[in-house]
């Protein structure tokens, strides 16, 4: 009986340690996801001086030949800053947890707008 109790206590301690480690890993995971989200936001909202585009949204400005067209393009885009679309977030959306949180927040917004 004493042997079983020792084994039980040993397993209980192992479980406690595993739960602590799980919490630490989840915190680190959340931190990494937030970092990816922030970097992605920075990249998607970047306003490069060349206005050539980026790998996610395309290179529409790449073939513009004259600097006059570039200046006009820059001026017209500067006042029409479009909000970021969550569908453009290919890295964040690849995370199951981010996609789940996004769906939940969209559901909450729809519920609030219906009230």
UniProtKB/Swiss-Prot annotation:
Protein name (database record): Chromatin modification-related protein EAF6
Broad class of the protein's primary localization: nucleus
Alphabetical UniProt keywords: Chromatin regulator, Coiled coil, DNA damage, DNA repair, Nucleus, Transcription, Transcription regulation
Subcellular location: Nucleus
Subunit architecture: Component of the NuA4 histone acetyltransferase complex.
Signal peptide residues on this chain, from the entry's feature table: none
PANTHER family assigned to the protein according to its UniProt record, in alphabetical order: CHROMATIN MODIFICATION-RELATED PROTEIN MEAF6 (PTHR13476)
Family statement: Belongs to the EAF6 family.
Example GO BP: chromatin organization
Keyword Zinc assigned: no
InterPro entries: Eaf6 (IPR015418)
Function: Component of the NuA4 histone acetyltransferase complex which is involved in transcriptional activation of selected genes principally by acetylation of nucleosomal histone H4 and H2A. The NuA4 complex is also involved in DNA repair.
Keyword DNA-binding: no
Taxonomic classification: Eukaryota, Fungi, Dikarya, Ascomycota, Saccharomycotina
Organism, as annotated: Kluyveromyces lactis (strain ATCC 8585 / CBS 2359 / DSM 70799 / NBRC 1267 / NRRL Y-1140 / WM37) (Yeast)
Residue ranges the record marks as coiled coil: 1-43
Any Pfam family hit: NuA4
GO cellular component terms given for this protein: histone acetyltransferase complex; nucleus
Domain of life (superkingdom): Eukaryota
